[in-house]
Structures are given as structure tokens and as C-alpha cells.
Amino acid sequence: MSATVADPCPRAGRPSRSASRRPGAAWRFWRSPAGQPPWARPALLATAVVAAVLYAWNITSSGFALYYSDAVKSMSVSWKALLFGAMDPGATITPDKIPGSFVPQALSARLFGFHAWSVTLPQCVEGVICVLVLHRVVRRWAGPVAGITAAALFTCTPVVASMFGHSMEDGGLTFCLVMAADCAQRALLDARLRSLVLSGVWVGLGFQAKMLQAWMVLPALATAYLVAAPVRLRRRVGHLLVAGVVCLAVSLSWVVMMTVVPAKDRPYVDGSTDNSAFAMVFGYNGLERFGIHVPGSVASTGSGGAARGTRPGGTASWRAGGFGGAPFPGTRAPGNGVFPAGGGKAARNGGTGEGTGSARPFAGGRGGPGAPGGGPGGMDAGPSWLKLFQSRFAPQIGWLYPFALLTLVLGVWWRRRAGRGDRTLGGLVLWGGWLVVVGVVFSAMGSIPHTAYMATLAPPLAALTAAGAVLMRRAYRAGGPRGWALPVAVAAEAVWSWYLSSFHPDFLPWLKWLTAAACLAGVAAMVLGRVTRRTRSRLVTAGVLAGLAGAVVTPVAWSASVLDPAYAGSAFDAGAGPSAMGGGRARAVPGAAGASRGGPGGDITTRLTADERKLYAYVKSRQGGARYVLATDGWNAASPYILATGDTVLPMGGFSGSVPHPSPGDFTALVRGGRLRFVLLSGSGGGFPGRGGTAGATGRVRTWVRAHCAAVPSARYGVTTTQAFGGGGTLYECAPERA
């Protein structure tokens, strides 16, 4: 017969407030509360300090994310732009995402000024809070050892260490989901409606940060409550319905606002062809990722995924590793005019490759806003059940896969006869459901444009691994067949770590040998303990600790590599350690590559070149009563002026270049009414090659401008060569009487 394994989550009563108080306790925050081991609070504080160091180490050179940084700048200088989440200071168009994640960044920039560090600061704070809250959640579920272990594992997940150090939406999403899990667990333990409703609120706020990705945790939270909440079924269902309504209301608040407010009083919704927030959220950023078109949504491009394998505009497929095609005239993309391709020569040289005469340092480093590593060519190749186990994602998130999955399978099997209200089973359902649902959805997606998406897998992986280590260690000491689970898990981790390390054999090559040696020693000691029935001896205990440490040493080293800017990822995409985009041996591009020319790290992209300053001074001095100082035929051409001045520059075409804003009629009305005088045509259209033609609304506007407006010679504003704008940018002056 197998021995009975003790519940790793004993139901210790909550100490009373009077019992937990100590003289001067408020001033001794480093001391553990009553009922916890003396080492618990110091260990937690040490973990939080490590997290803060990892996340904030490169904060001054963290860089900006193209396109989305324009929205942050605009929202920091205009209250209307902040309310609606506009991409430009004039609040004419939104980004192609719900702007909830940009609000903390914009408020920070408004308070401290617009710098790379001020935009990144909210993510650093969110990351440290995630560590503290995850510790609390797992401690309630599986005890203090598991709580500290989960916090440490989460801190040292490579993609997490990079993500919270940059201004990415995924940081806000992960923060909201961890807070939702905390509230859901409290509801699961005491069946209080308030806690469950708060969980729904946090998921709704997560929806504001990253839309439908936040809803992927709902099945896990709801199932865990149904399985383990200690109340009758009718009440459980009622609580879930109430919390679901609240979650839906918070989630759709921005969509409802944009639907109710008249179109003339709010920005146009990017990502849609009919100014529909619903189409942008549920089509462009939702079903389009699975190849399902929603009427009114723009077909997915680099931002939404390249599931269809075509270049915007229906031309040939993307070239691997970058956009290919000609440079972007009139823009200041780094290197040769295209986004750097995950470690290309131009990127490594600080973005100073040949091409546009005004090519300039590019803070942030490693890819464009549409895809890591330079473009959709670098994205995964479509739906695949092996996607999360391959070289792009697994080294960033998947080091703990074997241990976490074994914990889920064995834990559910061992607790299958537990009654309703079982805390252990409830936690397994919550975290296991989260892991499985998110993993399945990611595998089924047509493409995943950013590695940072994987960060939502980090909390369940850390929680399951930490709780599993405690559960399996107790099973090992108790004896019986279940006692073999721990050595099997450690052995599986050793094999898996060796496999993942093989993707990058030149990166810290000694690590895989250290991992193998530690895990082998641990497994040998555990087998010896089983054979001799001395599972509690010091030798066996040391072997267990060595095996567990060996299983996590490699991801810890990868995460620590973010202290070197060359391995810290970028504001475009998260990723610690060597890049997975360069054939398995590529070295990551420095996140502060742009600092090599003319300015300090991440702030470099907020400064206009000398030629851009001359052009801006020219149009500003002649703006008169016009509302817009300048219009451009793409966000890329508008971006330098928005970031540097915060002035009312009108970008046309949206992120993809195919959004019909403004329409030709609206554009001519702006000129006719004297609200727009100058237009800069770059010919590129949006941020993509192939958008510079005459098709579409922006193409027709471009044709009209060339036919009805006067080209301004560059010498008139002090620039003697059109190379200042990539050889293709032309400034036009439009007179109202000619509109």
C-alpha cells in the first residue's frame, strides 16, 4: 500500500490581529508575521530586491517602442488624448490597441517628463508587486516554502526579467492577472462574493491592457471556484454570474465609450476600416489571429500577425528576418531604413547602416513594432502544437515545463478523491487551468508577433513548480510509489534543460554541464535514499536540494543576463539571453544600441535631427491659425515630431497604412477650412513597404496633394538635399482656395 501524503496546504487558522501584533512591528517590516517561519519575510524582501534590480537595471537605456511610444507621448500632453487613448496629440486616431496599458506610462511621463526611464518605471513597479502578490497567493495555497519559491521562480523567468524592464503592454496585463488570481483565491477559500467580483474587475482591467488575452484565464478562475468554493452549487453559480457581469462591464468600458461618443468628438479607431472599436478589439486583435475575418477590421499585418503569410497589400511573402524591400523614405527607421532584423549588422552598429541619409540611432534595438527580430518573417509559422516547445519561445518561458506539468497531472490524480472545498485541488485547477488554456490558445493562434505574450504563462508555471516541489518532497519522505515522483521530475528537468541549452550552445556553455551534474547528483542521492529507506538523512536532503537547484540554475542565469544590455531585450519585444531568431546562435542586439550616436540611451529617439528641426521650424512659423502643424502620410514620418515636440501632427493611414483616416473628403475639408496647411509625403505609407501607392484612402489623399498642393523646395527651409528625408520625402503647402 502507498503511504498517505500529507496535505501541503494545512488549514491553519488565521491568527487574530491582537495575536499577530508585536511591539514596534510596524517599524520591523523585515520580521516575519506570526505563524510564518522567521526566514520568510527576509527571504521575500530579498527576492523583491532582486526583482527590482533585474527589472530596473537598464531603465535609463530601455528605449521606446515605435508607434506605441507616440501614443504615450500624446497621452502625456493632452487630456483628451489620455481619455480616449489617442496616438497623436491632436487626438485624431487611436493606436491599434486598447490604450489601457499606456495610461500608467503617460501619467508617469506627465509627472517626470517624457524619458525612457519614466515610461518604463510603471512596468518595473508592476513587476515587483507581481512578485510580492504571487508569493502571497502561493503561500496561502501551499505554504511559505512554496510561496518564496514561486516568487523566486517568477522573478527569474527570462521573458519576465526582460519584459518588466521595458515599456510593454504585457507587463500591465501580467500584473492585472496576478492580482485577479489573488482575489479569486481568497474567494475560493471563503466563498465571499466581494473577492470574486474584485477578481472580475482585475481581469477587466487586464482586458484594457491587452484585450482578449486577459479573458484566457477566466475558464480557470471559474472552474476553480466551482470545484472548491465551500458553498452550495446554486450560490457558486450565482456568484460567478455576478462576477462575470462585472468583468464584462469593466472589459468593454472603452469599447462602449468609443461606440457611444459621436465619431466627430473622438479619435478614429485604428485597426478598423469603419471606425469601429468592436472590429478593432474582436477582429483585428482577436479572431484575425486565427484567420477569421471580422467585417470592419483591418486584415492582420505585422502587428496582428502574419498568419496569411503575405505582405501588406497582398504582395509576396515577407522575407525572412526583416521586411525586405526598399528603405522607408521620409522616415527614420534604423539601419538601412527597415526595422533591424534581430542582430543584423546595422542594428549592432547602433542603427547606422547605409540607406537613408537621416538614418539615426534607434533606442531599443531588436525589432519593429510588428514583430520581434525585425518583422513578420521572424514570427512563428502559424498554428502548431509544438510552437511553445521550440527555439523561439521555450528558452524564454519553458524551462519549468516538465516539473509544472508533472505537478498538475500527479497532483490532480492524487487529490481526485478529495471533497469539495479542498484547497490543494482548487489551486491545481486554478493554476493548471490557466496554464493549459493559455498554452492551447497560443498554440492555435496563427502567429504570435511578440515573445512577450509568453509572460502570461510565467505565474502558473512558477506556482505549479513551487507547489509541486513541496508536494513531491513530502511524498518522497513518506515513501511508497509516489515517492518516485521527485527524482523523476528532477531527471526530466535535467534532460529538458539540456535540450533547451542546445539551441544556443555558445551561450554560457558550462551551464548545461552544471545542470546535468547537479541533477544527476540529486537523482542519485534520492534513489539511494529510497533504496536504503533513509529519505531524511542529511546526505539525501543535500542531494534533493542540489537536484532542485540544478533544475533552475540555467533560467536563473538567462534572467541574470539582462544586467548586460546586450542580452536585455528591447522595448519592441522581451527576451533575455541570446536571441532565438538568429538560427540558434545569434547574440542579442544591445537594447541601448542607439546610444552610440549623439545622446543618452533611450532618450535618443526624442530628438529631431538638424534637418528635421529646420523643417519643423519652417512649418511651425507658418502654421498661423491651422489646427495641425503638419500632416504626414504615415505614422513613421510623424513619429519624430510627435516624440520631440508633442505638437499636433496629423498621421494618416493608421499603423498598417490601410486605415481610411482621414478620408479624401475629410482631408480636403481640413485644407479648405484652413485647419491644415503643410503635408509631408514620404511615399512609404504607414510603417510598411508596399503602402506608398495610390490605392486606398491615404493613397488617394497622396495623389490629391501632389495634384493640388505646391511642393516646397527643401532649400527654402535650409536643407540643401532631399537626402535629409531618405531621398523621397517632399513637403507640400496646401492653399485653402485650391481645395
Which residues make up each language-model segment?
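Short helix-loop-beta junction
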Residues: 558, 643-654
